[in-house]
From Swiss-Prot:
Family: Belongs to the TFP11/STIP family.
Record carries keyword RNA-binding: no
Organism: Monodelphis domestica
Protein name per UniProt: Tuftelin-interacting protein 11
Function: Involved in pre-mRNA splicing, specifically in spliceosome disassembly during late-stage splicing events. Intron turnover seems to proceed through reactions in two lariat-intron associated complexes termed Intron Large (IL) and Intron Small (IS). In cooperation with DHX15 seems to mediate the transition of the U2, U5 and U6 snRNP-containing IL complex to the snRNP-free IS complex leading to efficient debranching and turnover of excised introns. May play a role in the differentiation of ameloblasts and odontoblasts or in the forming of the enamel extracellular matrix.
Disordered: annotated segments: 1-20, 85-132, 182-206
Assembly behavior: Identified in the spliceosome C complex. Found in the Intron Large (IL) complex, a post-mRNA release spliceosomal complex containing the excised intron, U2, U5 and U6 snRNPs, and splicing factors. Interacts with TUFT1. Interacts with DHX15; indicative for a recruitment of DHX15 to the IL complex. Interacts with GCFC2.
Residues annotated with Phosphoserine modification: 2, 97, 143, 209
Keyword annotations from UniProtKB, A to Z: Biomineralization, Cytoplasm, mRNA processing, mRNA splicing, Nucleus, Phosphoprotein, Spliceosome
A GO molecular-function descriptor: nucleic acid binding
Amino acid sequence: MSLSHLYREGEGAIDEEEDEMENFEITDWDLQNEFNPNRQRHWQTKEEATYGVWAERELEDERPSFGGKRSRDFSAPVNFISAGLKKAADEADEEDSDEEEKPIKQEDFPKDFGPKKLKTGGNFKPSQKGFVGGAKSFTDFGSWERHTKGIGQKLLQKMGYVPGKGLGKNAQGIINPIEAKQRKGKGAVGAYGSERTTQSVQDFPVVDSEEEAEEEFQKELSQWRKDPSGGKKKPKYSYKTVEELKAKGRIGKKLSAPQKELSQVKVIDMTGREQKVYYSYSQISHKHNIPEDGLQQQQLPLPGKDAKPQAFALPELEHNLQLLIDITEQEIIQNDRQLQYERDMVVNLSHELEKMSEVLSHEETVITNLSKVLEMVEECERRMQPDCSDPLTLDECARIFETLQEKYYEEYRMSDRVDLAVAIVYPLMKDYFKDWDPLKDCTYGTGIIAKWKSLLENDQILSHGGQDLAADAFHRLIWEMWMPFVRNIVTQWQPRNCDPMVDFLDSWVHIIPVWILDNILDQLIFPKLQKEVENWNPLTDTVPIHSWIHPWLPLMQSRLEPLYSPIRNKLSSALQKWHPSDSSAKLILQPWKDVFTPGSWEAFMVKNIVPKLGMCLNELIINPHQQHMDAFYWVIDWEGMISVSSLVGLLEKHFFPKWLQVLCSWLSNSPNYEEITKWYLGWKSMFSDQVLAHPSIKDKFNEALDIMNRAVSSNVGAYMQPGARENIAYLTHTERRKDFQYEAMQERREAENMAQRGIGMAASSVPMNFKDLIQTKAEEHNIVFMPVIGKRHEGKQLYTFGRIVVYIDRGVVFVQGEKTWVPTSLQSLIDMAK
């Protein structure tokens, strides 16, 4: 009698078709698990021993299992299983028996694949309701559509479905329904081979990888059985190559690196179970390492179904072997690192060798060049000796310095050229200029000095004593060797003979340094000119002052402004007894018109010339029958010297009242209108177009025309000359047409000027600020407006407006007064600048 009913797993061998009946015959599973101590047991309860098969089952019976046993559904109808399926199950048993005959090794067992989890094909229970009554064919599927019109078919046809083609926009759907293949027996999926249909094989061809996976699965599936041959598991070895160790580095726990012996330091080790005290760090490195792997191996496996007894275990030996392996791996890694370090060191040393070779080559080149430079300097020193038969000249010395600069530039730049120039060039330069007279030969030595300028200038050199020289070699050369000659000739020079000195400085202005030229003009030339201006008397001196002052304007420019005030004072004194009939005053004053500022010139004219001209016009007698024009010519000759407004004021005050009075008296005495017309046109032709364009002058001549028209229209006198009225009317029309044309032409010119300025200002269409407004006004009045470089007041930039120094702060212009800065208006600023 079999006791298989005591095992819950054995229920898979009971015939599932028999209602609540248990077979007591011995099955294959009973034979295979007869000597298996780890098989799962089901101990019979007291209730089962008493009632047997009529005992109530516990809830664990309802749990799913690999046996396929399920609780019966007694409410379902009785179904009968066809005999054909039984035959298929027998065939599956034969296949399983064939697989059991194959020897299975123990090492091929899966890790978590035990005998309790896999059963034979006959033990797998299919669904109670599956395949009952046999599988139905899909041939007559939807046969009712032959006699009826289904709503599904109609909807599909409305959406574009064509019978016989696939669904979808491009008819990409399948045409035939998915075929199903009936499984032969009651085994699991894949127990009877491939279950793929012909349609599946066509649509999805079988690849080799699936066949390999199937073979692998069958191989692992058969490993649940016990190895009948009783063979032992073959040990597996893991090999590591040197390349793997180099690539992955240290594998496993790191070994403590050797440390240097430190001084006696108390170290408390609390890493273990007990606190330990060490007196150096080296003792920690010598501490015994507990074999962790060994401890794990010493732990006994937990009792259970998968536990295997270990017959032979030596954890100490395994730890020592593992330690030797770790040490060997560490040595391999250390040796690889040392080898890589040595290779890197070789590469580094090779680079350093190349670099040192380059440095050595450069130093050799420098030594060679310095040797050649030293030879050239020694040669110059030898030729400068007094008893030398071939003395060194200044031109030859310049060529030697050119060679040093072109071929040995680095050595020449690093050398102390100031000392070299002082030792070699200065004696030669002094000997070169010893007989030179600058006023007689002003261009002597300009070529050789210009050459030395390119050789010695623009270098600030530190002397051997470490003191910073204020000037370079060329500046020192000019100051010490050239300036003494200039000082000597300036002390003997007469300022009224200015041409030789001006020519001399013009020849040297582009060669000598700027600060030396400023020193000559400020310290030597200007004091001589100032002293000569003080001694000048415009009444007695026959040489005009502008003849020896104006030639200095290109060189000195604004430096001469302090001389202008005493010159104006002396001229004012000389003009006190002057009469306009003396034309020499105009010859003396005319050269100064463009030198003085417009404001100072106009003030000088108004004070000294305009009153004299007014007196001359007062003395003018207007007589149409016998006119003397000398006084009028004396006044008109000053038109370019005095402003138009001043001249118009003189004419309005001293000329036109008398002229209109004479016209009225002439018209009241039976005049000849032709003579009056000629007289009118004659006086008008005496004035220039600029004067005639002035509105006041136009008004005076128009007033004369009105007087003439009134005289003609009022029939003054007993006799009227024929055509006089027409002539006067024609004259009036002609004159006014000329005035109109002149005004139109002036407006057109102003429009063109505005257009030109508009084109120039089109690019800068941004709103003008106060500074731009001042700049515009300065351009309109020909006043120089520019910033003073490097000068500020309270952080504000200083500007020069003519001769006035100003600064702008928040839209207000401030002018420098005697003690403080005073705010002023723009018009006042323009008046002060003039």
